[in-house]
């Protein structure tokens, strides 16, 4: 218990005091991320720059990273009646199928919980998502399954050409897709950045290699952080 209280004090000391702090786009650069190091043998906790990770590990240790690349999962569309909406993909495409959540008119500058409801749609409706013609296959509240006129590589190309990164109202400017990728991103599988690996920059990875630390990869999806609806958030993968 004494050790736990000490750990809490160290982490709590890093929190800004007073009112809520508005984060800026560059609030913490990848090189400025800090790492909480817990030493159970000495019952100590310290905070160090993340770049010191290679010195904390030993030759033969293994670091496993998630190599899922972040999709441009935010796409804007219209109904046949001209009503506008945003589609946020909730999973990678499968053939010609797109899985996602609809938000009403607006963009990331408005908090998700303050966005208007999306247009009403029904199975069989034809929509236009960016440049992609789709038909509604399933509807469950704001969750939808859409079938596109394109499939596989052609559909991926259109999504990458028209989509942007999902982001939220605490930032004012649109993020480029490269800004939400890890250094080792490979398979397009995450609808938001797998941010635990954000600070694993190339210099840290090279430092791990030089220290004899092994690096292995797996691909694991990262889902939507928020839809503005708590019940829907809990239902998403």
What spans do the regions from the language model cover?
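A cross-family signal for N-terminal binding/gating loops and helix N-caps
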Residues: 1-237
């Amino acid at each position: 218990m004494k050790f736990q209280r000490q750990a809490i004090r160290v982490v709590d000391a890093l929190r800004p005091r007073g009112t809520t702090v508005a984060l800026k786009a560059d609030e913490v650069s990848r090189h400025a991320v800090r790492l909480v190091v817990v030493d159970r043998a000495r019952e100590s906790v310290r905070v160090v720059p993340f770049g010191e990770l290679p010195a904390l590990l030993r030759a033969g240790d293994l670091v496993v990273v998630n190599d899922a690349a972040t999709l441009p999962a935010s796409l804007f569309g219209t109904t046949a009646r001209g009503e506008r909406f945003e589609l946020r993909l909730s999973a990678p495409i499968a053939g010609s199928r797109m899985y996602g959540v609809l938000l009403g008119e607006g963009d990331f500058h408005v908090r998700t919980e303050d966005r208007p409801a999306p247009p009403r749609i029904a199975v069989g409706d034809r929509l236009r998502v960016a440049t992609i013609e789709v038909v509604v296959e399933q509807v469950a509240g704001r969750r939808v399954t859409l079938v596109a006129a394109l499939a596989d590589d052609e559909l991926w190309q259109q999504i990458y050409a028209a989509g942007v990164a999902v982001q939220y109202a605490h930032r004012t400017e649109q993020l480029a897709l490269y800004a939400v990728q890890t250094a080792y991103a490979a398979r397009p599988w995450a609808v938001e950045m797998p941010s635990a690996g954000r600070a694993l920059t190339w210099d840290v990875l090279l430092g791990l290699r030089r220290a004899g630390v092994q690096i292995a990869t797996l691909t694991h999806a990262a889902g939507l952080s928020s839809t503005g609806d708590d019940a829907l958030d809990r239902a998403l993968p």
